[in-house]
Amino acid sequence: ATPGFKGKKSDAAELQPERNERFAQLQEMLYAGSRAADDNRSLLLVLQGMDTAGKGGITKHVVGAANPQGIRYTGFGVPTEEERKHNYLWRIRRALPPAGHIGVFDRSHYEDVLVVRVHNIVPPEVWGKRYDEINRFEKKLVDDGTTIIKVAMFVSLDEQKARLSERLERPDKYWKYNPADVDERLLWPSYQEAYQAMLERTSTDYAPWHVVPCDRKWYSRLAILELLIEALEGLNLSWPPADFDVKAEKKRLASA
């Protein structure tokens, strides 16, 4: 599914603060529920996309509106030596959000059916089995109380080039530039084929993919914010009741 918004950039800018506040409120309710009540629910936001799609911007401008103590962010790069000793899902399991938290994956386990496929890191008979493995893995997460929001962030080839060019023109952006990004551009058709297979094989009723066009940053940020709000509202969250006598505590405080 692709989230829709019929307004303009100015409309989004006007709406954003209000929606940020709503998201922050819901996130705090989720966190409070796990601290004060027997509530093991959590939420996992998976951001998967090509370089410059804006994954970091979502973390900063969307998720950043929430209380950081209830957020668990993990960026998945090239596997470390230790990670390569284990199954590809090992590092994913270690980063899953605890109860009451929102987990943010900047890239994810889907690298293991995208990058490994495009670069022939493992043979097809290996990565080909991973689609079903991932589906079973995510089904278990959902059954255990984790709501999964998977976002495929798509940026056009021209827009990616413009964003990479900007990084080369601005000294404050040099740190974000990676020469390997140009090499990856040459593999664009192969990546599009891999992404298509990913969407077809791993979009399920319990963990569907949401395809978000990302050439306009204001749109992608608002669209993903709305996905988060919709998912949290679907949990029917409420503030946990006091586990103490409120009236008695008011009297104690007044006389203290």
Language model segments and positions:
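Glycine-rich phosphate-binding loop of ATP-dependent small-molecule kinases
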Residues: 1-256
